[in-house]
A protein has these predicted regions:
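Flavin-dependent oxidoreductase catalytic cores
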Residues: 1-115
Length: 115
């Protein structure tokens, strides 16, 4: 069972990192097998963050608190950035959405880029 969590709402009085981590610990206890960390209801971008993987501080905090795999989604458009996020331990898996919509060969090109 996978759960996608809008961990960062970017809204006044919205979810905090502590809220997200606490929720993920409870989800793991309830039997969730994988958590996908993404933005929240306030939009799909994060104000003040333009780096690829702009929810990586949330995924890192969640990863430190749970023993199940954590997937990071958010602005990841380049294979090298995805690989760097994985290698640095920010997440166990990377979610790519809009980049695939823009380029149907994204996955094939990404494999070539990191090999």
């Amino acid at each position: 069972l996978a759960l996608r969590l809008g961990a960062c709402e970017s809204l006044t009085n919205g979810n905090t990192m502590e809220d997200a981590v606490s929720a993920c610990v409870q989800f793991e206890k309830a039997g969730v097998d994988l958590i996908d960390i993404t933005g929240g209801l306030g939009g799909y971008v994060r104000p003040g963050h333009s780096e690829q993987g702009y929810f990586q501080d949330f995924s890192t905090a969640v990863k430190q608190a749970v023993s199940i795999p954590v997937l990071l989604t958010g602005g990841i458009t380049e294979a090298a950035a995805a690989d760097a996020l994985l290698q640095s331990g920010k997440a166990d898996l990377i979610g790519v959405g809009r980049a695939l919509l823009k380029d149907s060969d994204w996955a094939k090109n990404a494999l070539c880029a990191v090999q």
